[in-house]
Amino acid sequence: MSGNGNAAATAEENSPKMRVIRVGTRKSQLARIQTDSVVATLKASYPGLQFEIIAMSTTGDKILDTALSKIGEKSLFTKELEHALEKNEVDLVVHSLKDLPTVLPPGFTIGAICKRENPHDAVVFHPKFVGKTLETLPEKSVVGTSSLRRAAQLQRKFPHLEFRSIRGNLNTRLRKLDEQQEFSAIILATAGLQRMGWHNRVGQILHPEECMYAVGQGALGVEVRAKDQDILDLVGVLHDPETLLRCIAERAFLRHLEGGCSVPVAVHTAMKDGQLYLTGGVWSLDGSDSIQETMQATIHVPAQHEDGPEDDPQLVGITARNIPRGPQLAAQNLGISLANLLLSKGAKNILDVARQLNDAH
């Protein structure tokens, strides 16, 4: 009898209710805020589980004197976190989706994509230029951005401005803007500013005609071990179906173009009346040469937790077992079709030249 009692006690200790789920994140304040929001949602869904947040620095956090596009290494903000995932030191990792490459290392998958916040870019102005827009900034004003995508589009749109690289986390960039006289304004992701509670610093939100956004911008991705079915089931509740389908289309477009950090590629997606609209573009580094096109596809946005595919093969690095396969494939095909259209119009040449120029500098 006593033996059975011990077995029952052991089973209770090993039951999922007692389990601590370890969540990996970057150390920056924004990353911690984003991770806290994901953990809060998981806690609400699984009140019996405990969650421990483990923060670590990544290569991208450490190399702050070089433009991201020049470092010449993929997975700048993800490699150390993936290493911890691989060694079973954490069970899942919360990322900004735009930091996750469209091809993940073997053994990993994006197990959830959370509801997207505003994906557009924002302009934050130096205190002396508050009330201005990019259009009304004085001639030769210097605007800071760490992104080739932003610089290429904005140089084309605002030729009277000069664009220079600015690195560091959000706090560091804002301090550089406010305390030094080098920059009249800087460009940042609206979602990051909003998550930090800095709505009052948003001086201008850039519309798609001015600057399309990065693939996955404004959404959070939760990376897990691809074979860890328990954790895949656990994080599945975080999937937002519309965000998922938009981001599958965007990531398929980028992957098929073979774009990345070192080339200016941008997108804009919208879901309306059962249609998914995808606009994508590529630019030369100075913005003088560009190709942009829009395509659409009829896609039914499923309700969360309709029964999805059981075999769960990944699409552009994403596993969404609780979302039907048909809409996911339709979104992926839309991204591939748009990429093929741009490639047929000469996108590869623009991107190759951009890559060579970026590598040469």
From Swiss-Prot:
Enzyme Commission no: 2.5.1.61
Variant or mutagenesis effect after changing R167W: In AIP and ENCEP; severely decreased hydroxymethylbilane synthase activity; results in less than 5% of wild-type activity; 2-fold decrease of Vmax; 33-fold increase of KM
PTM annotation (S-(dipyrrolylmethanemethyl)cysteine): residues: C261
Protein name per its UniProtKB record: Porphobilinogen deaminase
Cofactor binding: number and manner: Binds 1 dipyrromethane group covalently.
Reaction(s) this enzyme catalyzes, per UniProt: 4 porphobilinogen + H2O = hydroxymethylbilane + 4 NH4(+)
Mutagenesis or variant effect for E250D: In AIP; less than 1% of wild-type deaminase activity
GO biological process terms held by the UniProt record: heme A biosynthetic process; heme B biosynthetic process; heme biosynthetic process; heme O biosynthetic process; protoporphyrinogen IX biosynthetic process
Consequence when changing K132N: Found in a patient with unclear porphyria-related biochemical findings and abdominal pain; uncertain significance; does not affect hydroxymethylbilane synthase activity; does not affect Vmax; does not affect KM; does not affect thermal stability
Gene Ontology CC annotation, any one: cytosol
Co-factor(s): dipyrromethane
Outcome reported for the amino acid change (mutating R167Q): In AIP, ENCEP and LENCEP; decreased hydroxymethylbilane synthase activity due to defective enzyme-intermediate complexes turnover and regeneration of free enzyme molecules
Domain of life: Eukaryota
GO molecular function term, any single one: hydroxymethylbilane synthase activity
Temperature dependence: Displays high thermal stability. The half-denaturation temperature (Tm) is about 74 degrees Celsius.
Entry's family note: Belongs to the HMBS family.
Result of altering R26H: In AIP; severely decreased in hydroxymethylbilane synthase activity
Outcome when changing C247F: In AIP; residual activity
Impact when changing G111R: In AIP; severely decreased hydroxymethylbilane synthase activity
Effect caused by changing T35M: In AIP; severely decreased hydroxymethylbilane synthase activity
Location(s), subcellular: Cytoplasm, Cytosol
Gene3D superfamilies hit by this protein: Periplasmic binding protein-like II, Porphobilinogen deaminase, C-terminal domain
N6-acetyllysine: residues carrying this PTM: K74
Keyword entries, A-Z: Acetylation, Cytoplasm, Disease variant, Heme biosynthesis, Phosphoprotein, Porphyrin biosynthesis, Transferase
Enzyme class: transferase
Sites bearing N-acetylserine, chain numbering: S2
